[in-house]
């Protein structure tokens, strides 16, 4: 297989990958879960245990809005129910250089995405007749300089029971503690069930064939480390899974919100859809907690609302870092991302880090690249003998195949030797592709000049054009031209086909491919010099 045919194989693999990506985006089949059921409840609060099936109507009014802030996010809390109705991520701009924080959670007439939690059950304070109206003095609470954590308690009292809903902010963390401290002085035992859910407008995932993005639910259970559960899945079948530990989440490209309940108890993961209001909720329901008279009880949970920071999320809950979904190429993407991050820490530029990683990858693959060109050179030398066999055996394909295999063995030539570097290069490319789609660290990461966001397409298409030119040069430097006229025409169009597809790819990925082509050209010339000395190659006239 010569270089030009290698390009054709690469193109077929590449286009097949894009077609598969679009098919995955479009099909949205119902997902088979461990257990599915229809939950009859409104979208603000789930039903409690079967024996005490209560639900609460959607809140039509607001309580007082208070603001909580640490060094990475600013939250707005509704004192009616204690829901988180807004989260502004202070270290991430909404748009490139906008200087306006990206708002992940928000509640507007056009779009709802909020984090709700409460206490349901026999003595729950979130009931069909209304939700708990918490009290607190002050409106703004901010983590002070030198302070590592901040606790903000909301207070509600009813029938001799004092409920504190305590929000705990930590420095440098998007992990918000949401705890309940219950003091039962009612004279009799009470029973409550904690829940937490993420309520989101039902929308379709966005993006295109080159850069698909997922917006929808996901969960982790004792049986399933990580699984996406789209809004279409929720509309087809409401989720209901009993599990030890686990978590539920809503993913939005580079960002995620996730409820993490107490990991030491059994929880039920569920979804609720409200077609009338076009919203869906994914949440957890904890076990019944009995609090004897005169006793106190603390119920813990946490809410992650922020970017997909793999290292931090891994410390918050098992498998939460899997929301950075690299697909089947994860085993390549993870070390590549680690290498990218390590080099970026040295050079302080993600574009330079990509160039360095490309050099490392090409250096690792160099022995295979050398073997590829050596195999191709030997195959060219054998062409006269192979043509003679074709003429001698004519239509006897079996005999011709046997004789050719014998010839390959005698000459120590592997006819598939030219394919291996191409086949190894594609998984690396796909792994980098998913890294650019999933790694928030590359969002709005500049290179230089006109490239100010390596996760977005080149605004002036300069890199894709340069990449196409490099492919054309690489093709022209191929030592043996394709003899079949039809195949020749196809090969001549390959650089244009690739350039067209790469117009919409992340500029960082195009940069990788461009640098890879340039290194391949340099390696090719180095290898050819060695082959010329062995008489296996001659310069094209």
UniProtKB/Swiss-Prot annotation:
<keyword id="KW-1133">Transmembrane helix</keyword>
<feature type="transmembrane region" description="Helical">
    <location>
        <begin position="454"/>
        <end position="474"/>
    </location>
</feature>
<keyword id="KW-0813">Transport</keyword>
<feature type="transmembrane region" description="Helical">
    <location>
        <begin position="416"/>
        <end position="436"/>
    </location>
</feature>
<feature type="transmembrane region" description="Helical">
    <location>
        <begin position="6"/>
        <end position="26"/>
    </location>
</feature>
<dbReference type="InterPro" id="IPR028053">
    <property type="entry name" value="Membr_insert_YidC_N"/>
</dbReference>
<dbReference type="Pfam" id="PF02096">
    <property type="entry name" value="60KD_IMP"/>
</dbReference>
<dbReference type="InterPro" id="IPR019998">
    <property type="entry name" value="Membr_insert_YidC"/>
</dbReference>
<dbReference type="InterPro" id="IPR038221">
    <property type="entry name" value="YidC_periplasmic_sf"/>
</dbReference>
<dbReference type="InterPro" id="IPR001708">
    <property type="entry name" value="YidC/ALB3/OXA1/COX18"/>
</dbReference>
<keyword id="KW-0653">Protein transport</keyword>
<feature type="transmembrane region" description="Helical">
    <location>
        <begin position="337"/>
        <end position="357"/>
    </location>
</feature>
<keyword id="KW-1003">Cell membrane</keyword>
<dbReference type="GO" id="GO:0051205">
    <property type="term" value="P:protein insertion into membrane"/>
</dbReference>
<comment type="subunit">
    <text>Interacts with the Sec translocase complex via SecD. Specifically interacts with transmembrane segments of nascent integral membrane proteins during membrane integration.</text>
</comment>
<keyword id="KW-0812">Transmembrane</keyword>
<keyword id="KW-0997">Cell inner membrane</keyword>
<protein>
    <recommendedName>
        <fullName>Membrane protein insertase YidC</fullName>
    </recommendedName>
</protein>
<feature type="region of interest" description="Disordered">
    <location>
        <begin position="34"/>
        <end position="56"/>
    </location>
</feature>
<feature type="transmembrane region" description="Helical">
    <location>
        <begin position="495"/>
        <end position="515"/>
    </location>
</feature>
<dbReference type="InterPro" id="IPR028055">
    <property type="entry name" value="YidC/Oxa/ALB_C"/>
</dbReference>
<keyword id="KW-0143">Chaperone</keyword>
<comment type="function">
    <text>Required for the insertion and/or proper folding and/or complex formation of integral membrane proteins into the membrane. Involved in integration of membrane proteins that insert both dependently and independently of the Sec translocase complex, as well as at least some lipoproteins. Aids folding of multispanning membrane proteins.</text>
</comment>
<dbReference type="Pfam" id="PF14849">
    <property type="entry name" value="YidC_periplas"/>
</dbReference>
<dbReference type="GO" id="GO:0015031">
    <property type="term" value="P:protein transport"/>
</dbReference>
<dbReference type="GO" id="GO:0032977">
    <property type="term" value="F:membrane insertase activity"/>
</dbReference>
<dbReference type="InterPro" id="IPR047196">
    <property type="entry name" value="YidC_ALB_C"/>
</dbReference>
<dbReference type="GO" id="GO:0005886">
    <property type="term" value="C:plasma membrane"/>
</dbReference>
<comment type="similarity">
    <text>Belongs to the OXA1/ALB3/YidC family. Type 1 subfamily.</text>
</comment>
<keyword id="KW-0472">Membrane</keyword>
């Amino acid at each position: 297989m010569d270089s030009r045919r290698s390009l054709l194989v690469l193109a077929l693999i590449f286009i097949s990958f894009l077609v598969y990506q679009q098919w995955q985006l479009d099909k949205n089949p119902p997902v088979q879960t461990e257990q599915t059921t229809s939950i009859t409840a409104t979208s603000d609060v789930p039903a409690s245990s079967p024996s005490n099936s209560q639900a609460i109507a959607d809140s039509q009014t607001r309580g007082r809005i208070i603001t909580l802030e640490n060094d990475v996010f600013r939250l707005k809390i509704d004192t009616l129910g204690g829901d988180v109705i807004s989260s502004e991520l202070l270290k991430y701009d909404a748009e490139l250089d906008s200087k306006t924080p990206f708002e992940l959670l928000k509640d507007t007439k056009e779009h709802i995405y909020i984090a709700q939690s409460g206490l349901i059950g026999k003595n729950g304070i979130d009931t069909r007749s209304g939700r708990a109206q918490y009290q607190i003095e002050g409106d703004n609470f901010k983590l002070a300089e030198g302070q590592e954590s901040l606790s903000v308690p909301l207070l509600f009292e009813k029938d001799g029971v004092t409920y504190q809903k305590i929000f705990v902010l930590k420095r440098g963390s998007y992990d918000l503690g949401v705890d309940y401290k219950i003091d039962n002085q009612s004279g009799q035992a009470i029973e409550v069930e904690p829940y937490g859910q993420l309520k989101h407008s039902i929308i379709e995932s966005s993006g295109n064939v080159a850069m698909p993005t997922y917006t929808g639910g996901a969960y982790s259970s004792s049986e399933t480390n990580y699984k996406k559960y789209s809004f279409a899945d929720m509309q087809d079948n409401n989720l209901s899974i009993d599990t030890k530990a686990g978590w539920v989440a809503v993913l939005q490209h580079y960002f995620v919100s996730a409820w993490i309940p107490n990991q030491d108890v059994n929880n039920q993961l569920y979804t609720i859809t409200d077609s009338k209001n076009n919203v869906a909720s994914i949440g957890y329901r904890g076990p019944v907690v009995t609090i004897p008279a005169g006793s106190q009880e603390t119920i813990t949970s946490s809410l992650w609302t922020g970017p997909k920071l793999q290292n931090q999320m891994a410390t918050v809950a098992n498998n939460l870092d899997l929301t950075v979904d690299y697909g089947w190429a994860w085993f390549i993407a993870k070390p590549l991302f680690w290498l990218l991050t390590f080099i970026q820490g040295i050079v302080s530029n993600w574009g330079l880090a990509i160039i360095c990683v490309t050099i490392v990858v090409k250096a690792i693959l160099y022995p295979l690249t050398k073997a590829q060109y050596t195999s191709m050179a030997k195959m060219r030398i054998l062409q006269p003998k192979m043509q003679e066999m074709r003429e001698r055996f004519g239509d006897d394909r079996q005999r011709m195949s046997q004789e050719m295999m014998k010839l390959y063995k005698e000459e120590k030539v592997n006819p598939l030797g030219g394919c291996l570097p191409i086949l190894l290069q594609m998984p690396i490319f796909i792994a980098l592709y998913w890294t650019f789609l999933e790694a928030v660290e590359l969002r709005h990461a500049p290179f230089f000049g006109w490239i100010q966001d390596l996760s977005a397409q080149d605004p002036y298409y300069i890199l894709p054009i340069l990449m196409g030119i490099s492919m054309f040069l690489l093709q022209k430097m191929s030592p043996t031209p394709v003899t079949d006229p039809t195949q020749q025409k196809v090969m001549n169009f390959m650089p244009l086909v690739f350039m067209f597809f790469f117009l919409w790819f992340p500029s960082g990925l195009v940069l990788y491919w461009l640098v890879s082509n340039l290194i391949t050209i340099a390696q090719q010339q180095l290898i050819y010099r060695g082959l010329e000395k062995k008489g296996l190659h001659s310069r094209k006239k």
